[in-house]
Amino acid sequence: MNIKYILTHPIQYQSPLIRFLNKNININVAYRSNISLRSYYDKDFDKKIIINNKLLVGYKHVFLKHFGSNEVTNVKPITTEFVKNILSNNIEIIWLHGIYNWYNFVIILLAKIYKKKVFVRTETNNLKKNSLFKNILKKIYYKFIDIFIDCYLSIGTENKLNYVSHGINPKKIFNVPYVVDNDFFFIKNKQKSKKFRILFTGKLIHRKGCDILIKAINILNKDLKFKRRTEIIIVGEGQMKVKLLEFVKKNNLDNIKFVGFKKQNLIKTYYKKTSLFIMPSREENWGLAVNEAMASKNAIICSTSVGCSKDLVKNNYNGYIFKNDNHKDLARKIHKIYKNPKKLNKFKINSYKIISKWS
């Protein structure tokens, strides 16, 4: 079986999966841009990102020639190397990540002309409420494009529900869960600490909701014992950092520590130090950092708008789910775990049990 997997650019979460699949099937990746192989400015992180040289190790790949900018958007980069590198005779399956950009739309149509099977994987869900008009447009689009697609690869429950809501036959949907390298993040012996440590990782932007977490801590810090016994570690950079720091300083939230942006291999050291991972996102298609934290034996709290919550977070088993954009509810959930160390330890063990079967 020869598969051509088409992606915009090398991504740290995609490469381990591709390497794993390449052990048993012949997979060749076509990238439209090499932007992630050089240092570049990330607007959301508000920081220059240094390249990861291991993104291309362990599988066959090609970079398609393009003209103009190699910036990754819904339109760019522009390439015309459809037939030569994507639709050659030895390719049986075209696998696409995403369905709405013009490039993938054209490839889907051409693939059928060249009698290739088309697999599609997206990250979309119904957690973000769209207008009635937008939902109607999506249903019309899916009804047309579905004619040319052989199967949909679902990353989780919310993603599958999204396909079905747009009229896709469930028989065409196959589970290909969103995963990380559990072995890489597995921590046999957690670092012991007298403090109750909480971890947030991500871009410091409105969508990621770090401000919700900080407001929750501001409520909890009214209990001085909580303030003395806890440490909240914020890993990340972004446009909201200055405002967040101002709020922390104004309210004397001394137990909140900002440690800046860290590469994936360094984030692992923070998972080792902490007991509770919080993803307070206002919108999140999946949330792979939850996978990482669970593989590192952390209890989990995430918002109702995090895509992985139905699959990975079980209320009162390995953590809690709080109401989206509600810092008071988040504070209540944190306090439930903080005041019950035995429950916390059970949650940590149960997190690893769940994620071990999600690999």
Stretches found by the model and what they are:
Residues I99-W102, K116-I136, F148-C151:
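A short, histidine- and acid-enriched strand-loop-helix "catalytic/donor-clamping" loop
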Residues K134, Y142-I187:
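Donor nucleotide-sugar binding/catalytic pocket of nucleotide-sugar-dependent glycosyltransferases
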Residues Q191-K208, I212-I217, I233:
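Conserved donor-binding/catalytic core segment of Leloir-type glycosyltransferases
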Residues V242-K262:
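Nucleotide-activated donor-binding/catalytic signature segment of Leloir-type glycosyltransferases, i.e.
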Residues F261-K262, T269-T274:
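Short alpha-helical donor nucleotide-sugar binding micro-motif in glycosyltransferases
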Residues R282:
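Aromatic "clamp/platform" in nucleotide-sugar-dependent glycosyltransferases that forms part
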Residues A299-S303:
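Short hydrophobic beta-strand element within catalytic cores of glycosyltransferases
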Residues D329, K336, K343-K357:
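A short, well-ordered alpha-helix in the C-terminal region of glycosyltransferases
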